[in-house]
Curated annotation (Swiss-Prot):
InterPro entries: ACT-like_dom_sf, ACT_dom, HD/PDEase_dom, HD_domain, NT_sf, PII_UdlTrfase/GS_AdlTrfase, Polymerase_NTP_transf_dom, UTase/UR. This is Bifunctional uridylyltransferase/uridylyl-removing enzyme. Keywords: Hydrolase, Magnesium, Multifunctional enzyme, Nucleotidyltransferase, Repeat, Transferase. Residues 706-789, 816-891 form the ACT domain. Residues 461-583 form the HD domain. Uridylyltransferase (UTase) activity is inhibited by glutamine, while glutamine activates uridylyl-removing (UR) activity. Belongs to the GlnD family. It comes from Pseudomonas aeruginosa (strain UCBPP-PA14).
């Protein structure tokens, strides 16, 4: 604990303050306020964090001692005030609980009841956040024996006031000779850590990590020290060096990592004004600035700060693994004779764990740095790596240099790992964990811990990359065939599966460099393939996959898949079935690895539709594109067959169809054409809009709900419809809008409920939607107001300037308006309102929500049903959209991009 520091607490001055005041509370509060201000100023000036949190604990010691002395405990009283937990370690952050144990000699508390109650009341009155317990020595023993948390807390204790003999007796009766022997304690603590890690999804890379509890956080360091304390009676990192569990460099790294997390935690408490261990988005930017990070041309300050954070916790996790493995070998020795199984001259198994056969293996044969991972992939029964071998791996990383990277033995071993029938993902993770992967592939090293500061990418780039490879491996499992039927079928027939894993490893390798990461990554992928002696065709395929890994997802979500030209253009890009197969599988894995919430039946079916239509185009031959007239005839013939079977007159159907135009038949299936036609012909001609709702049968929108609206066209049709749907808590995924020559609108919307599920066959919900839409369309003057809902905290934090792009599609004679904006409740209704103000008609729309942002595409025309040709109109439209979508945004706007 620190020496006396009068600037923090001056006993003489404090006693004088007490004498001047009628109530002691004001003097105590002033003293607390003073040391808090001094410590916060010292923190802001960059003082040593270890000293700061120890100084805070010392200050609280002084306050407690002064408070304790105000009560009559009796002469030679057997009562002791003990600091426990983190405060017992002498570590205290600004708003951490002050954990106290009032320790008694006997269970008879009656003689001390009044002073104890007065003491605790005073602590609460002066503003100390106290967690307290009152126990006898025997009660401590009983509760510690039954509760892992209690024994852990009692292991870290200091006497603040009263005789220390009581604390010593308590430590003696709760020692490992009486309860929780080191083996039992180790197993319980290891299980506790596993449960805690599972709570945080077993990853260091959560978007809003908990600096205390998340994997790699402060609790992982404390867990190591608790285990050491129970085994050796020591409770600091240097003791682990003396016991041979750490080397000096590892001890220094753990200490500096702990201090970094302490600084982050201190800053969190200071910024939040309360105990806060979650590194929330609200605080990440503030702490980045506080720590001196600045934006540059490539990365935001917050991204650089978070990369530092993730690399620190990754390093802590790595050493936590190493030390716990070492503890396991020491504390849990095998009761059976040691089983040694040679693998080759360099490696052997000891009780199922792989280890080197001698300490100089890596020095004499550096290729063994890669060979060990290939062996583990080839022998999935291997439980893990022995602690000494993990340390040798870490200490031998410097042997991986340019000469090593170009040695054919090493390049061959690395490719061999990708050809393994199992264990690819597991051993790439191990390589990353032990620092080998980033050393062997420096370009991978650059993306370790790199976070993209948004809600769309919920993992760092390296974690996302390894998750993608994990997902590719999962597609090979039979149990995945139900959820991913097409991808599972395709991956089984890929001629060279190793190529998809290499493409997955490199698809985001150039993130964070500036420029187009797909283009830059393709160059890196090509260089990798060439240096690893892959044939030219394989090299071209991998490089092409990296360069185009976003194209299939973008096409499926933002283009009209019913347009034959869209399919033809995509088929031209793909070129052949092999490229299509590889790209489809990579895209499925990429979406799932980016953010699990992104993958739903709607996105799945979009991709499947694009794959199927492109496959047909390739089989037909790119020189034989789809004939629009033939496609229309096929749709009409199939629809007519259904209608005639249902008793609909052919002439009536064809009369209606003559008013609908070609686009209607290109953008709807025969089944939907028949459904619409029968309902329209049977609908009374009384001006009431026709609203049909069902689960969609379209392959690209399975599990969505289809809403079909047929009504007299009106200029506010789209605006009123989307506003009404917003009020009905519907999320629009796709819109297909047709205006007939008789001035009737035929709109089809694919929707999900706001929670992402389909409406299903719920009669009450369907009736509510139908009635709500009919009422809105019958009374357009009562245009539904936009619902003002609370913007979620995370969305508020990721506000950015809306971007609006307007271009002209000369072939289809429409303007294409693309909106990229922060997601907000009622956003589509706001856009519809702007279209209404500008007298614009929406011909088609593609809706995509990606994390905190929406990327919507609208195909629009002016009042004369022509593309927007007036630059001034486009600028005013853009300005209006940006202003509307910037509400509650707090960001500057971006100029439009208009292409005619």
């Amino acid at each position: 604990m620190p020496q006396v520091d009068p600037e923090l607490f001056d006993r003489g001055q404090f006693q004088a303050e007490l004498a001047l005041k009628s109530s002691p509370i004001a003097a105590f509060k002033k003293a607390i306020r003073q040391f808090r201000e001094v410590l916060d100023n010292r923190f802001n000036s960059g003082r040593d964090i270890r000293r700061l949190i120890e100084d805070r604990a010392w200050c609280v010691d002084q306050i407690l001692q002064q408070a304790w002395q105000r009560f009559d405990w009796g002469d030679d009283a057997d009562i002791t005030l003990v600091a426990v937990g983190g405060y017992g370690r002498g570590e205290l952050h600004p708003y951490s609980d002050v954990d106290l144990l009032i320790l008694l000699d006997s269970e008879d508390q009656e003689s001390f009841r009044e002073p104890i109650e007065g003491f605790l009341t005073l602590l609460w009155d002066i503003g100390l956040e106290v967690g307290q317990s009152v126990r006898s020595v025997q009660q401590c023993a009983e509760e510690a024996r039954a509760d892992l948390t209690v024994i852990t807390t009692l292991m870290e204790c200091r006497t603040i006031c009263g005789p220390d003999s009581l604390r010593q007796r308590m430590l003696q009766v709760t020692g490992s000779a009486h309860m929780w022997p080191s083996k039992e304690f180790f197993l319980a603590k290891r299980h506790e850590q596993q449960r805690r890690h599972a709570k945080y999804n077993d990853t260091e890379y959560n978007l809003e990590p908990n600096v205390k509890g998340s994997p790699g956080g402060l609790r992982d360091i404390q867990t190591i020290l608790w285990m050491a304390r129970r085994q050796f009676g020591s409770l600091n990192l240097h003791a682990l060096v003396r016991e041979g569990f750490l080397v000096e460099s590892e001890c220094s790294m753990l200490a500096s990592s702990q201090e970094f997390l302490w600084r982050v935690r201190y800053a969190l408490h200071m910024l939040a004004g309360r105990a806060e261990d979650r590194l929330l988005f609200d605080h990440q930017r503030s702490i980045a600035r506080l720590f001196g990070y600045e934006d540059n041309d490539v990365k935001l300050a917050v991204e650089r700060f978070m990369q530092k954070y993730y690399r620190v916790v990754m390093a802590i996790s790595e050493l936590n693994d190493l030390i716990i493995q070492h503890f396991e070998e020491v504390i849990l020795p095998c009761e059976q004779p040691v089983q040694i199984q040679p693998l080759n001259s360099r490696f052997q198994l000891r009780d199922g764990y792989i280890e080197v056969t001698h300490p100089n293996v890596f020095k004499r044969t550096p290729f063994a740095l890669l060979e060990i991972f290939v062996l583990m992939a080839q022998h999935p029964e291997i439980k893990g790596v022995r602690a000494d071998t993990i340390r040798l791996l870490r200490d031998s990383r410097h042997l991986i240099d340019d000469e090593f990277r170009h040695d054919i033995r090493n390049t061959s071993l690395f490719i061999e790992l990708f050809k393994s029938s199992q264990g690819i993902h597991r051993n790439l993770r191990r390589m990353n964990r032990y620092g080998i992967l980033g050393r062997y592939l420096p370009e991978f090293g650059h993306i370790i811990g790199q976070m993209q500061h948004d809600l769309f990418h919920i993992y760092t780039v390296d974690a996302h990359t390894l998750n993608l490879i994990k997902h590719l491996r999962k597609l090979n499992r039979p149990e995945m065939a139900e959820k991913y039927p097409l991808a599972s079928k395709i991956i089984d027939r890929l001629p060279k599966p190793e190529l998809i894993y290499i493409a997955g490893l490199y698809h985001d390798i150039a993130k964070g460099r500036g420029g187009d990461h797909s283009e830059l990554g393709a160059v890196d992928a090509e260089a990798f393939c060439q240096s690893h002696q892959l044939p030219p065709w394989d090299t071209q395929l991998v490089s092409w996959l990296v360069q185009n890994h976003l194209v299939m997802s973008t096409t499926a979500q933002r283009k009209d898949l019913s347009d034959p030209q869209v399919i033809f253009d995509f088929a031209q890009l793909v070129g052949d079935q092999t490229h299509l197969d590889y790209l489809y599988v990579l895209t499925v894995a990429d979406i799932n690895a980016t953010n699990p919430t992104l993958w739903n039946s709607w996105r799945a079916s979009l991709l499947r539709q694009l794959y199927t239509e492109t496959k047909r185009a390739l089989r037909r031959g790119l020189e034989n594109p789809v004939d629009r007239e033939e496609q229309i005839r096929q749709t009409q013939t199939a629809a007519l067959d259904q209608l005639v079977r249902n008793g609909i007159d052919q002439d009536d159907a064809e009369q209606l169809w003559s008013q609908l135009g070609d686009d209607y038949f290109l953008r709807h299936t025969a089944g939907d054409v028949a459904w619409h036609t029968e309902a329209i012909l049977q609908h009374p001609d009384d001006g009431t809009p026709l609203v049909l709702i069902k689960e969609t049968t379209q392959r690209e929108f399975e599990s969505g709900s289809q809403i079909f609206i047929y009504a007299a066209d009106q200029h506010d049709f789209f605006a009123v419809t989307v506003a009404a749907m917003d009020q009905l808590n519907l999320s629009i995924q796709d819109a297909r809008i047709i205006t007939s020559t008789s001035q009737f609108t035929l709109d089809t919307y694919i929707v999900l409920d706001a929670d992402g599920d389909s409406i299903g066959n719920n009669p009450e919900r369907i009736a509510e939607i139908r009635e709500g839409l009919i009422d809105a369309l019958k009374n357009p003057d009562d245009y539904p107001t936009i619902i003002q809902r609370r913007v979620p905290r995370q969305l508020k934090h990721f506000a950015f300037a809306p971007q609006v792009t307007i271009s002209t599609d000369a072939l289809r004679q429409v303007s294409v308006l693309e909106v990229i904006a922060p997601d907000r409740p009622g956003l589509l209704a706001r856009i519809g309102g702007i279209f209404l103000d500008f007298d614009l008609s929406v011909q088609n729309a593609k809706i995509a929500t990606l994390g905190e942002r929406v990327e919507d595409v609208f195909y629009i025309t002016d009042a004369r049903n022509q593309p927007l040709a007036d630059p001034d109109l486009c600028k005013r439209l853009q300005a209006a959209l940006v202003e509307q979508l910037s509400q509650d945004n707090g960001r500057d706007t971006l100029p439009t991009r208009i292409n005619f």
